[in-house]
Amino acid sequence: MIVNRADPEQLDGIEEAVAALRPQKTTPVWAIPEDRTLVAPSIDGILAAVDGRLIKGDPDRLGREALTIVVAGMSMVNVLPRLTEESVVVIPADRTEVLLATLLADASGTFPRVAGIILNGPFPLPEPIVQLPDGFTS
């Protein structure tokens, strides 16, 4: 018997509990720990789900997994501490200061690396904002 998505800190206890309930005591029991990356959607999958398109960035990064989602409908001062490793950050398209702060945080090396950014809303990005990240590396 195999128990999947098990709490990594409780593997032995889970195996023992399941072993006690098995009908045939000779059947081995294993527990496989939860792995967030196995259930995380890819950036490409999220892009398809929201009918989005790549505006900037390396298309090779679209295969990365999004481990969490940060909804950034707040000022950059409040968004930055909420960034987590490999998160997708959803930013209102008219909050360009939050977009720029997120891009800078991602490039800085002092904040968690984000997996992607989704801009939400009908507002086009101003051309200077589109040009600014051209000097950043992916």
Residue spans for each PLM region:
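Beta-strand-loop-alpha "switch" segments that mediate conformational coupling across diverse proteins
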Residues: 26-36
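Gly/Thr-rich phosphate-binding loop signature of adenosyl cofactor/nucleotide-binding cores
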Residues: 49, 53-106
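A short acidic, often aromatic-flanked loop/helix-cap motif at beta-alpha or helix-coil junctions
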Residues: 35-40, 62
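Residue-level "edge-of-site" marker
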Residues: 4, 34, 60
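Feature captures the catalytic cores and cofactor-binding loops of soluble hydro-lyases/lyases
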Residues: 1-23, 28, 78-80, 92-138
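Conserved GTPase G-domain signal focused on the G5
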Residues: 10, 39-42
